From Swiss-Prot:
Its EC number is 6.3.5.-. NCBIfam families: gatC. It holds the Pfam family GatC. Allows the formation of correctly charged Asn-tRNA(Asn) or Gln-tRNA(Gln) through the transamidation of misacylated Asp-tRNA(Asn) or Glu-tRNA(Gln) in organisms which lack either or both of asparaginyl-tRNA or glutaminyl-tRNA synthetases. The reaction takes place in the presence of glutamine and ATP through an activated phospho-Asp-tRNA(Asn) or phospho-Glu-tRNA(Gln). Keywords: ATP-binding, Ligase, Nucleotide-binding, Protein biosynthesis. One of its GO terms (molecular function) is ATP binding. Heterotrimer of A, B and C subunits. Belongs to the GatC family. InterPro entries: Asp/Glu-ADT_sf_sub_c, GatC. The gene is gatC. GO terms for biological process: glutaminyl-tRNAGln biosynthesis via transamidation; regulation of translational fidelity; translation. HAMAP family: GatC. This is Aspartyl/glutamyl-tRNA(Asn/Gln) amidotransferase subunit C. It comes from Clostridium botulinum (strain Eklund 17B / Type B).
Amino acid sequence: MSVTKKDVEYVAELARLSFNEDEKESLASDLNQILNYVEKLQELDTEKEDIIVNPYYIENKFREDEITPSIKLEEVLENAPKTLEEYVLVPTIIREQ
């Protein structure tokens, strides 16, 4: 499988990105190099290798999930530029085509 300029254009459109022609060619080339590397990795024979999820034993250092006091909804709404009932209104970013 190889990535074409048309593939880059399609994904860019989905992500709402724009690239010039040189960037499209460069991205297609970079993505093809990545795919070639992944293909090489898939050729490796790992049947005799031990499964290692994590080579180091790392203990979870995160705190426990506990409910803590937070800012009140009224305070949030007072600081928002626009609100509707208990929602903060934000500018539209994505519109239907």
